[in-house]
Amino acid sequence: ASINPGQTDSLFLTTPFTPTVIGTYNVAKTFAADSTDDVPANNVLGANFSFDVTNYIYARDNGVANGYTDNGTDLFQAGNFYDIWANQSVKGVDVRFATGTPVGSEVYARIHKIDPVSGDIVYVGESAVISLAAGQINTNITLLLTSPIQMESGVTYFVMVGTYSPNVRISTA
């Protein structure tokens, strides 16, 4: 394929990669062309990266809490979408509440799935509402679900943490 000057394009994997063993996987991005590039310095592939495969954690996290999102004085929920590749049972949601979150804030975890046929968002389950103690702020905690949720292969889930309290800060990494 040819890309004309000033145009952009995207590259996609034709064969998906599924890790087969527990460990760290390193991803290096490279590009090769059969023509001379006039300005190779403007080719952007993004940084190389690595990810870990573990027995029990599926996370979107770089391991360094370096910011937060908050709700000001409003109720809110924040989370991520997760594609599930094998049937799994989930028992809790890990989260970190940033410094400045008021002690006593009421928080919870909730999980929805995207119906693969209709595209509707369907409630699946949640944790009990807890009141945050001082020792639960600026540290990773697990919000245990009221009962385990069986996640289905091939389904996308929206895993979120929410609050009924003002000024709650959910760490970002």
Question: What residues fall within each predicted segment?
Answer:
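Intrinsically disordered, low-complexity Pro/Gly/Ser/Thr-rich segments with frequent PxxP/GP/PP motifs
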Residues: 1-22
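Short proline/glycine- and polar residue-rich coil/turn motifs
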Residues: 2-9, 130-139
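Coil residues (strongly favoring Ser/Thr
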Residues: 10, 35, 53-54, 116, ...
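Short, surface-exposed tryptophan/glycine-enriched loops
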Residues: 141-155
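Beta-strand-connecting loops/turns
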Residues: 6, 22-23, 138, 152-154
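Beta-sheet-rich sandwich/jelly-roll-like modules and their strand-loop junctions
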Residues: 42-117, 151-156, 162-173
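Terminal connector regions
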Residues: 18-51
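Short Trp-Ser/Thr-centered turn/loop motifs at beta-strand boundaries
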Residues: 125-127
